[in-house]
């Protein structure tokens, strides 16, 4: 038997860090939404009791470092599943980009194995399991648009943002999320108004959403990696309505209301950045199929 699952990327429309917890994690408030840039996960049942992960992308690990592997291992151990599975990951989301590609692959694996192994778990139960794998996995199990709090595992669904285009550009650098958080000084950064973003989304006001974009991690990453700031400036110059870094970076996204502007922005960025994408905002939970 074979199961196919879609694993869409997410962007942060608003990302605030409110405090550091005793366990080393940070308390966050994030508005996350899914976009139409997705990996494909193919799950095939194996007769032997093993987990095999494969991908055509050489940057995708095929062992326990892979979050999809961890998702399968968690389900096997928690529910005493004696069957094996082959997990084929077709990567479309760039790796280590701040777009939750690995987390979304893990979430898709949880959803798919729930069907393949007939575990009959609810989406809420899958999301709770996802939180054991990584902070973004809970959101990715659901998809759509949500306010994430705690360390990112507490999910409250909100309306989808107004429809628009999203242009993304990822420079060829790596960003250490741990270093970004370590350098973050919560007293010296401008904190986004997360509630104002929720209100803008509920009003379906594209202009207000653009006005409330904010990421408390952005100033840290920009200070470490000037290339990210350069991409932000170029994206604005080419005509994006609003521009922000996603997650801890290095990917920058621009919101674009009118399709007529998208190609110019895309072409302009392709002149100096290899990984550029122009996709639609999804933002709805039922859009994963």
From Swiss-Prot:
Enzyme Commission number(s) from the entry: 2.7.1.148
Signal peptide: none
Disulfide bridge map: none
Keywords noted in UniProt: ATP-binding, Isoprene biosynthesis, Kinase, Nucleotide-binding, Transferase
Top enzyme class: transferase
Gene3D superfamilies in UniProt: 3.30.230.10, GHMP kinase, C-terminal domain
Catalytic activity: 4-CDP-2-C-methyl-D-erythritol + ATP = 4-CDP-2-C-methyl-D-erythritol 2-phosphate + ADP + H(+)
Kinase recorded as keyword: yes
Record: residues binding ATP: 94-104
Cross-referenced HAMAP family: IspE
Protein name per the record: 4-diphosphocytidyl-2-C-methyl-D-erythritol kinase
């Amino acid at each position: 038997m074979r199961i196919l699952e879609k694993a869409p990327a997410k962007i942060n429309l608003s990302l605030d860090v409110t405090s550091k917890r005793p366990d080393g994690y940070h308390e966050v408030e994030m508005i996350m939404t899914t976009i139409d840039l997705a990996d494909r996960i193919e799950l095939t049942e194996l007769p032997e009791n093993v987990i095999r992960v494969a991908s055509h992308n050489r940057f995708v690990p095929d062992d326990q470092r892979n979050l999809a592997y961890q998702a399968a291992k968690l389900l096997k151990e928690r529910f005493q599943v004696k069957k094996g599975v082959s997990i084929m990951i077709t990567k479309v989301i760039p790796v280590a980009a701040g777009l939750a590609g690995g987390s979304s692959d893990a979430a898709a694996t949880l959803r798919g194995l729930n069907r393949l192994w007939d575990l009959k778990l609810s989406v809420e139960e899958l999301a709770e399991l996802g939180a054991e794998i990584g902070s973004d996995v809970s959101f990715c199990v659901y998809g759509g648009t949500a306010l994430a709090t705690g360390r990112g595992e507490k999910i409250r669904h909100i309306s989808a943002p107004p429809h628009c285009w999203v242009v993304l550009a990822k420079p060829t650098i790596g960003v250490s999320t741990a270093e970004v958080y370590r350098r973050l000084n919560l007293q010296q950064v401008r904190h986004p108004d997360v509630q104002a973003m929720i209100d803008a989304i509920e009003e379906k006001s594209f202009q207000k959403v653009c006005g409330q974009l904010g990421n408390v991690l952005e100033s840290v990453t920009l200070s470490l990696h000037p290339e990210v700031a350069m991409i932000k400036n170029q994206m604005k110059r080419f005509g994006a309505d609003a521009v922000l870094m996603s997650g801890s970076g290095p990917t920058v996204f621009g919101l674009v209301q009118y399709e007529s502007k998208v190609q110019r922005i895309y072409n302009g960025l392709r002149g100096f950045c290899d990984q550029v994408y122009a996709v639609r905002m999804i933002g709805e939970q039922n859009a994963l199929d």
